[in-house]
């Protein structure tokens, strides 16, 4: 069920996700974790929206429900939803877990076009987040929000500019995170070039 939902793209496949959630698939047992997984697969593909998320949260009032709800809101494929998630990640006082789930929801490769506008914003707020948030929140933000959704020479150049200029005096831990993320993107670009 997870593999199917995670790769569903056609209207019929997306309708099947809704059918799974509705309990009409014989022999499929859906626990809370699988329900959220299937639901979020639908959210990130535009099948379900904010009202549906509210309904799911009403069904699952546990701590896990709140975490998955935060992820679901960040998975909504719209510029407005991504902007709200980015703002929450970088400015709100979220718990470590809610913050992590929001980051993971925000940064989804299905939403590359929507997320392209957030590359510069990431590098603009990085130092402030590092200086004003606790270590775990700052480290999670630096790592999970690194703009891996736009694998390009331009993103590598922006990371290098941050290392050379904006973040030249940043903490060793933050610089290491950006260096490692930049290097991973350089390797990805080389792999792409080799495949062509």
Please describe what each predicted stretch is:
Residues 1-196:
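Long, ordered, helix-rich scaffold segments
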């Amino acid at each position: 069920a997870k593999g199917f939902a995670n790769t569903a793209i056609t209207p019929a496949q997306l309708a099947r996700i809704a059918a799974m959630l509705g309990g009409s698939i014989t022999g499929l047992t859906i626990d809370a974790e699988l329900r959220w997984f299937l639901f979020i697969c639908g959210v990130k593909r535009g099948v379900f929206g904010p009202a549906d998320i509210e309904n799911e949260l009403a069904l699952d009032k546990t701590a896990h429900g709140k975490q998955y709800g935060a992820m679901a809101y960040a998975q909504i494929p719209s510029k407005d939803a991504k902007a709200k998630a980015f703002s929450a990640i970088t400015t709100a006082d979220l718990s470590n877990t809610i913050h992590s789930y929001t980051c993971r929801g925000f940064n989804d490769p299905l939403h590359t076009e929507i997320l392209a506008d957030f590359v510069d914003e990431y590098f603009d707020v990085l130092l402030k987040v590092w200086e004003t948030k606790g270590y775990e929140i700052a480290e999670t933000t630096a790592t999970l929000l690194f703009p891996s959704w736009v694998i390009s020479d331009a993103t590598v150049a922006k990371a290098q500019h941050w290392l050379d200029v904006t973040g030249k005096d940043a903490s060793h831990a933050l610089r290491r995170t950006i260096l490692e993320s930049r290097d991973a993107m350089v390797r990805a670009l080389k792999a792409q070039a080799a495949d062509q």
